[in-house]
Design a protein with these regions (language model features):
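Core alpha/beta catalytic barrel or barrel-like domain that forms the active/cofactor pocket
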Residues: 8-24, 49-67, 92-105, 341-348, ...
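Short, hydrophobic beta-strand segments
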Residues: 21-31, 65-72, 311-316, 352-354, ...
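Alpha-helix capping and helix-loop boundary segments enriched in small/acidic/polar residues
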Residues: 11-15, 29-37, 57-61, 65-76, ...
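Long hydrophobic segments that form regular secondary structure
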Residues: 2, 121-215, 304-311, 315, ...
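Iron-sulfur cluster-binding electron-transfer modules in prokaryotic oxidoreductases
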Residues: 90, 97, 112, 218-551
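Helical (often loop-to-helix) elements that flank the catalytic cores of nucleotide-handling enzymes
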Residues: 30-49, 74-85
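Conserved alpha/beta core surface patches that mediate binding of polyanionic ligands
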Residues: 1-14, 37-46, 50-51, 138-141, ...
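Ferredoxin-type iron-sulfur electron-transfer modules and their immediate structural context
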Residues: 51-56, 63-200, 219-233, 238, ...
Length: 551
């Protein structure tokens, strides 16, 4: 009623266990009048809380926001006792000054200066859903949910979990991005300090789903890197990683030569030193033939005569060149379950370009994929992908990078795009895939779900798909990001952090698994990290399910 009297609404969320209600009035603190209204509403809220003998803070601290209302809530006499206790234990006022006693007015250090215009820098991504890139960074409310340990679980934020460094939290990155974009200089994107802080972001996208405000640091990092690259020419290694699909395509006709140089101890060490890859890391090798060539040769024989459905298979660059076994397993699994597969001459997923901030090049690939795949994909023929980081770009970055003309088609395509595990779990739920199609033999499966898969789709489809065989016991490793994060863990300056992230939960769980336990990971870089970090071979879910398929 009080908020309504001022014409205001509020966002509410609560903790059942502590009986606490969070109230976030929708107030524009950039407006001088609204900023004054903040104090008025806070004062009236404090009086309401006092009236009903409640607490202003619940299980939270009072701090600078609520400290000035403590005398009202507990009474002047009790407040004087608090001040006496504070003086006894902290006579010089050096321990958290101004947080509970002698707190300054709650509106004396507001983040925004009322009346100061919000910058509107041009961007490559479409940030219109939150009012522009500056407001995307401003979404952070400082709650600190990103400051959690691996013991608590979840995905956000792996670099903080491994280091405990506040600078590497989602909160710190969002706020320093905000300050950078408000900076009064010709090019606010030209900041080495921002580059170094964002450099240790693994782009797991955990903040996209776990941050209460939905701050997407991976998206902000990608945008920043394009502007930074415009001023500071990227290194040879950065260009190589971004152009990896082209390099793979070039060597796909002579994979033996590529693999010799990649696996020979002497030549591999030279490559790593020249490019800046970690000496401890093994270089991914090329498959003897591409998945696309294999499909052209074998698909007609695999496709069922009387299919129960049809899918358009997205041939991503990682499956195409590196993970032929996973691709073959996916094709045999889907056709064995009764689905007809089609595939088109799609471009690469643009994942390497997006990760390294080459957004102009990424847009070209995105445009081609939309134009090529759009006419083929529908409710009756969904787009299904094998590598999570590649296929999920259709649902995440593609609509925001497609441009005004293609955005509607990109959004439509996103609605019909699924990971392999999502598709299989959905078809099982619909009754078109049945348990009887799979073995009754028992098996234990330990699975690490790809970080972007967890952030965008959740782990549930992976666990559901792997659990279709009736006697398969599936357990998810309670890990966040594996630590490899695409090319991140290959880079020499990031190797140690990648290992620390892996050692938080993933590596110990894999090492403790019995020799007969099936280790599973949908992500190509996750599987590589598990192999390098533990010596165990992790399989793609398609390989696990194909081995369980009857007939």
């Amino acid at each position: 009623e009080m908020l309504a009297s001022y014409g205001k609404e509020s966002v509410y969320h609560a903790h059942i266990g502590t009986g606490e209600l969070h109230v976030r009035p929708l107030i524009n603190l950039k407006d001088a009048g609204e900023a004054k209204l903040l104090r008025t509403i806070a004062e009236e809220t404090a009086r309401i809380v006092k009236k009903y003998r409640g607490s202003m803070s619940g299980e939270h601290g009072d701090g600078r926001l609520r400290g000035e209302f403590i005398p009202l809530i507990i009474g002047a006499g009790n407040y004087k006792l608090n001040k006496r206790i504070k003086r006894v234990f902290d006579p010089n006022g050096i321990l958290n000054p101004g947080k509970i006693t002698d707190t300054p007015p709650m509106d004396s250090s507001l983040r925004y200066i009322p009346g100061k215009p919000t910058p509107e820098p041009a961007t490559h991504y479409d940030f219109s859903d939150c009012g522009g890139v500056v407001r995307a960074a401003e979404k952070c409310n400082g709650s600190g949910d990103c400051r959690k340990s691996s013991v608590i679980g979840g995905l956000m934020c792996p670099s903080f979990m491994a280091t405990g460094d506040e600078r590497l939290t989602t909160r710190a990155r969002a706020n320093i991005m905000r300050e950078m974009l408000y900076a009064d200089r010709d090019n606010p994107w030209d900041s080495r300090e921002i580059y170094e802080i964002l450099d240790l972001c693994l782009a797991c996208k955990g903040c996209r789903s776990e941050c209460p405000s939905g701050v997407d640091i991976a998206k902000l990092k990608s945008e920043f890197l394009q502007h930074y690259n415009d001023v500071h020419p990227p290194s040879l290694r950065t260009r190589l990683i971004a152009s990896l699909p082209k390099i793979y395509s070039l060597f796909s006709f002579i994979p033996g030569i590529f693999n010799f140089f990649a696996t020979n101890k002497f030549t591999a060490l030279i490559i790593k030193r020249v490019t800046g890859f970690a000496a401890e890391r093994s270089i991914p090798v090329l498959a003897p033939q591409t998945f696309r060539r294999w499909l052209k040769k074998n698909l007609s024989a695999l496709n069922p005569a009387n299919p129960i459905g049809e899918i358009c298979l997205f041939v991503d660059e990682f499956t195409n060149h590196n993970d032929l076994d996973a691709g073959k397993a996916a094709a045999k699994l889907l056709t064995g379950l009764g689905y007809r597969i089609t595939f088109a001459g799609n471009a690469a997923s643009a994942r390497t370009y997006i990760s390294k901030g080459f957004l102009r090049q990424a847009k070209k690939l995105i445009t081609k994929n939309i134009l090529v795949l759009g006419p083929l994909v529908s409710d009756d023929c969904p787009l299904v992908g094998i590598e999570p980081s590649a296929i999920l770009g259709f649902r995440d970055e593609f609509p925001d990078l497609a441009g005004d003309k293609l955005r509607p088609e990109a959004s439509r395509l996103a609605q019909h795009t699924f990971t392999l595990e999502e598709f299989i779990a959905g078809e099982f739920s619909a009754g078109r895939i049945k348990r009887e199609m799979f073995t009754r033999e028992p098996a234990e499966v330990l699975v690490h779900v790809h970080c972007q898969e967890k952030a965008i789709t959740t782990s549930a489809p992976v666990l559901a798909a792997l659990g279709i065989p009736v006697n398969y016991k599936v357990r998810e490793i309670p890990s966040g990001c594996c630590g490899m994060a695409g090319a991140f863990g290959y880079e020499k300056e990031h190797f140690e952090l990648a290992q620390k992230v892996g050692e938080l939960v993933l590596f110990p769980d894999v090492r403790s698994a019995s020799a007969g336990t099936i280790i599973c990971a949908p992500g190509t870089s996750c599987r590589h990290h598990v192999k390098d970090g533990t010596g165990r071979v992790a399989l793609h879910p398609a390989e696990v399910l194909l081995a369980a398929l009857r007939g």
